[in-house]
């Protein structure tokens, strides 16, 4: 989108960081809004480096200790957990598994596909993919519930909760309209936010959002391990975009 419409006013966001932050905050005994999460990465591909409370105390070392000692083995599910399938419960639990395997930083949940690639592939069913699972489950129940709400003209007692991502979008829009300059994790042009990563790459970092736009927080230099993983992922992404825009079979391959 940046390449095709460079002047477009847009924000690219994902609900996964805020979902995971709420789960972590609940485990630590805090409201998510009372914590400041330091984070860097790409969309669906990032790490938490620090978690500060309002006293300026970093809570990530304690979380790391709890993970390594076996005190915590998984994260609780999000607000509408009652309607989530086993995939999400396993995914949330794999956050802790990934953190234990690589304890420098806490990974975003989707890193399960990169940290545990062989294991995930062994569990993959070519005859019934994740997309098939959603179509056969979540999509049907959501449409059924929406139909019920329309027929009864009431959303009372509905199990469908806008939850984390819905509130996140509203909070972000409110920050823009009212120039609150609140902090959100957003996908933006790097432009030096991550000092040792391509400046023209889109990265996912904390930003202050207000009426005048988005101001990324300086992350600084990141470790070589995480940088290398990001470069491999970004290389694929850039080639995929170029293949699409140029109609190039070679780049797609």
Regions found by a protein language model. Name each.
Residues 1-24:
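Rossmann-like NAD(P)(H) cofactor-binding subdomain of soluble oxidoreductases
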Residues 20-253:
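Long, compositionally biased stretches enriched for glycine and/or charged residues
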């Amino acid at each position: 989108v940046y390449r095709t419409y460079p002047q477009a006013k847009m924000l690219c966001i994902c609900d996964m960081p805020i979902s995971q932050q709420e789960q972590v905050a609940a485990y630590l005994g805090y409201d998510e809004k009372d914590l400041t999460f330091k984070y860097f990465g790409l969309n669906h591909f990032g790490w938490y480096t620090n978690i500060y409370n309002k006293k300026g105390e970093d809570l990530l070392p304690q979380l790391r200790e709890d993970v390594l000692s076996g005190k915590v083995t998984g994260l609780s599910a999000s607000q509408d957990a009652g309607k989530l399938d086993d995939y999400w419960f396993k995914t949330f639990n794999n956050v802790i598994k990934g953190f234990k395997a690589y304890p420098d930083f806490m990974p975003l949940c989707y890193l399960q596909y990169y940290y545990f690639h062989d294991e995930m592939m062994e569990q993959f069913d070519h005859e019934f993919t994740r997309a098939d699972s959603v179509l056969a489950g979540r999509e049907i129940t959501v449409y059924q519930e929406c139909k019920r709400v329309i027929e009864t003209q009431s959303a009372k007692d509905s199990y469908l909760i806008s939850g984390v991502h819905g509130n996140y979008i509203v909070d972000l829009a409110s920050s823009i309209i009212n120039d609150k300059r609140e902090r959100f994790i957003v996908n933006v042009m790097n432009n030096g936010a991550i000092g040792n990563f391509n400046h023209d790459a889109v990265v996912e970092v904390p930003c202050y959002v207000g009426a005048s736009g988005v101001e990324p927080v300086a992350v600084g230099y990141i470790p070589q391990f995480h940088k290398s993983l990001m470069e491999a992922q970004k290389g694929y992404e850039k080639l995929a975009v170029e293949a699409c825009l140029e109609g190039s079979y070679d780049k797609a391959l």
